[in-house]
Regions:
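Glycine-rich, histidine-containing beta strand-loop boundary motifs that form or position
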Residues: 64, 105, 118-121
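Short, charge-rich binding segments
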Residues: 83-85, 94-100, 105-111, 149-150
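Conserved, structured C-terminal
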Residues: 1-25, 34, 111-449
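Charge-dense polyanion-binding interfaces
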Residues: 84-95, 99, 185-193
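Acidic, proline/glycine-enriched N-terminal capping motif
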Residues: 1-91, 100, 335
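Acidic side chains
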Residues: 54, 68, 96, 103-104, ...
């Protein structure tokens, strides 16, 4: 084992909890303009008309090409791959040998022997590691996110989201386009360039008819495609969205995208840790919040905890299959939305600014996540029953809320819980001195906007 690996770094620092709690980094970065108009109107646009986000910078894109592409993906993904191929897409789920979630990413079927994984670096790196070390006849093609890539990206990505998304694309195209099924990929021309588009949604209910299209193509075509979309969108009141609004989209859709990945411990992931560099994403990631446990494994989740049961298919062999089969009929935690009490939120906002010696942890508006992995304790009757993850405000919900994972008995509409806001002790310069406080919250098992 060399010294320049994640595994070596963990040994030097004294384990994953110490490393993550001391890391100075904040929330996952979106290197784009903060606002184009203002984040409130930008949030409202994805419900009332449409919004266009430029996703060309913040996500890692790793491609796989060759005769073993399908075999590689099937060996690592919990999803079924029986019908996967060209112009198909999936929310790819990867687990360790104990059935604990490593992460998810969007899998694009570009050709029958070519696919790409797009998202935060964890899952693309996990699959690339196996492609390079597992004896697969696969070429790995990396297009790093902008923070790790001083050059130009290979592709542009534009997310067009909202009820007028299809009308805007058709106006830009100059006529009707063929219907693209949910989580399928279609193509058409814009500004004389071939554009491919995935039908999925970042807000609202997944499966809505073409209310969300992720358009992508060669980077050199991006400016012309963007111009024609902006021109077409004027008639419909479309807005461009900035990083502030973008950070809140998952709150409405319910995508809990950044739990601690189950890669920091265990023999089944040791090779991966020894393959990763000591200065990469998982080495620099940070952990914050009031949820405090003795072992990093207490922060891990399973696909069942996040509602991904329908993405776990036992029609093929994959890493974690045996564990997930054994776990499937047990009681699991559940993902829920927590609507924070308006009075308590108002008190928090004031306390973070005017609290003096009793200052509370600053509640950044509209998105108050201050680490890569945000874990705040959820209590019921004084006992810890789960953790709150992403938290923030959207005008569409009309209040402050968070995504959470709680014990099943508390995952019922109207259940009352409290969220502990603030950390038990400052460990990072980026977190100000403050006192912890409790916020009342109400459980909802369905989206709040």
């Amino acid at each position: 084992m060399t010294n320049n690996t994640l595994e070596a770094r963990l040994h030097r620092i004294g384990g994953p909890l110490r490393m993550l709690r001391a890391a100075p980094g904040g929330a996952y970065p979106f290197p784009m303009r903060a606002e184009f108009t203002n984040w409130r109107d930008e949030q409202e646009a994805w419900k009332s008309t449409a919004i266009l986000f430029d996703q060309s910078f913040h996500m890692t894109d790793v491609g796989f090409r060759g005769p073993d592409t399908g075999r590689l993906l099937s060996a690592l993904g919990t999803n079924s791959f029986r019908t996967f191929g060209r112009n198909k897409a999936k929310q790819f789920i990867a687990c360790d040998a104990q059935g604990r979630l490593i992460g998810d990413a969007i899998l694009f079927g570009l050709e029958d022997d070519r696919a790409s994984l797009v998202g935060s670096p964890t899952v693309p790196d996990w699959v690339a590691y196996h492609a390079e070390t597992g004896g697969y006849d696969v070429e790995v093609i990396r297009d790093e996110r902008s923070l790790a890539n001083p050059g130009r990206r290979a592709l542009y990505r534009y997310q067009l989201q909202g009820p007028r998304a299809q009308a805007i694309v058709e106006k830009a195209h100059g006529g009707p386009i063929d219907r693209i099924k949910f989580f399928a990929i279609g193509d058409f021309t814009l500004a004389g360039h071939r554009v491919r588009a995935l039908n999925h949604t970042m807000t609202g209910a997944p499966g809505d008819e073409m209310t969300g299209l992720e358009l992508f193509g060669p980077a050199e075509d991006g400016p012309a495609v963007l111009d024609v979309l902006l021109a077409a969108g004027e008639e419909f009141g479309m807005r461009q969205g900035g990083a502030i609004a973008y950070s809140t989209t998952a709150l409405e859709s319910g995508w809990l995208g950044l739990p601690v990945p189950a890669v920091y411990t265990g023999e089944s992931t040791r090779g991966f840790r020894e393959w990763l560099g000591a200065d990469g994403y998982l080495s620099a990631a940070s952990l914050a919040g009031s949820y405090s446990a003795e072992h990093i494994e207490d922060y891990y989740v399973t696909p069942y905890d996040l509602g991904y049961r329908n993405m776990v298919r036992f029609d093929h062999d994959f890493i974690g299959r045996q564990a997930l089969e054994e776990l499937q009929d047990r009681t699991h935690r559940r993902k829920v939305w927590l609507r924070w009490n308006d009075e308590d939120v108002t008190r928090l906002l004031a306390g973070g600014l005017f609290g003096g010696e009793l200052r509370t942890k600053y509640l950044a508006v509209p998105y108050a996540v201050y680490a890569t992995f945000q874990y705040d304790a959820v209590l019921a009757g004084g006992a810890q029953v789960g953790f709150s993850n992403r938290t923030g405000y959207t005008v569409n919900a009309g209040g402050w809320f968070s995504l959470a994972v709680v014990d099943e008995e508390h995952a019922r509409d109207g259940a009352e819980v409290t969220v502990v806001w603030g950390e038990p002790g400052g460990t990072r310069d980026g977190v100000e001195r403050h006192v912890q406080t409790e916020v009342r919250a109400t459980v909802s098992t369905s989206p709040l906007a």
